[in-house]
Amino acid sequence: METFGHVDWLSVTFDADFDERLIEAYVGTFKTLGAGSHGYTRRAQSKAGAVLLADGERRQGKSLTLSGTVLEGLRTILESDGPILDFISHHKGRASRLDLALDIVEATITPQSLWAEYQAGMARTSTRSNLALTSNERGVETFYIGSRQSDKFLRVYDKALEQKMDAKSWLRLELVCRRLVARSYVSSMVEQKSIRPFINRAITEFCDFPLSAEFREATAQDNADVPTLARKIPHFWRWMETQVIPAMASRQVEFPEENVLKTLTLLYHKHLEKRGRNLRPNDALLDSSE
């Protein structure tokens, strides 16, 4: 049995001023193909297959997508995903999608065997959403744990069947991460000497198959810290972050003599009282007696 862990998809947004010639050193020169989507007026593709969306509204920045094929080609030159992750971090890129793949090759483990373990209630996972896709010849060939509309879900599938390699055993576990999860994971992976333990830990924390000896062996090295994020930002904090705080910051500039932070603290206290919570010392952003 052989196992491999790697990044299999990476979508990143850079600031509008990002010099795309910097990434061309890795993926080759970009050629404009036409108009982009989602408000971008330019879509370009590099020699290696990287896709760039640019020239939209300034707040949109520039969007770069590296597919599994592009990343595989980069690994043959750079030897790992580390240099690309370092580049993204150095240039303040913000990941919007990150796929972490674990390949288990030439083993007896199959999507069907792991699905049976999951159906028997023996897999450990915090999500109840799932979907299985069946092939008449091999039973379950692909299944998903978690909603495909969420920020994180696991896809388990027969990679050999996908690649039409019938004589080979090749199982892939693919953890698809989006938005805040993707951004947090990329930031954490930059700090790792090797990303393989991080991939193992990220997968097993989301869904573990303890009865499969081959799965346990493939994910045995998992001594990495994986950040835990809230599933959804509460509406109150989203309102504070997107509307109240920017407005108060603008008011502080306009009226420097006014104690805007004190006003913000009082608003926070009212929110706690509305929820029926007793105020504690740590709940105060600023002592309201000032």
Can you annotate each of these PLM segments?
Residues M1-R231, W239-E290:
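Structured, helix-rich domain cores that form ligand/interaction pockets
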